[in-house]
Amino acid sequence: MKDNFYKDVEIALERIQKIIRRTPLQFSPSLSEESEAEVFLKLENYQVTGSFKARGASNKLMLLSEENPKKIITASSGNHGSAVAYAAGILNLDTLIFLP
């Protein structure tokens, strides 16, 4: 199962790498000391949309775009909606995002 998961992650990364930013890792001395392990923070706030949601939304919309959907519809109270709007714009997908 581990091997399949790792392979799926590699495939997703290859799929989305052209539309997402490669964000840095930052070593956290305080968290590392507290946990007695090396802890790094992934700075996804540097992503185009300001959160990690761009990765999952881009991957899903790229997969869906292969099926030529008429419209993508989603609901979000924040980051997911921004990520879907970003990816849909790049992929030229008709999208409706409901913000409650």
Predicted regions and their residues:
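PLP-dependent amino-acid enzyme catalytic core
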Residues: 1-100
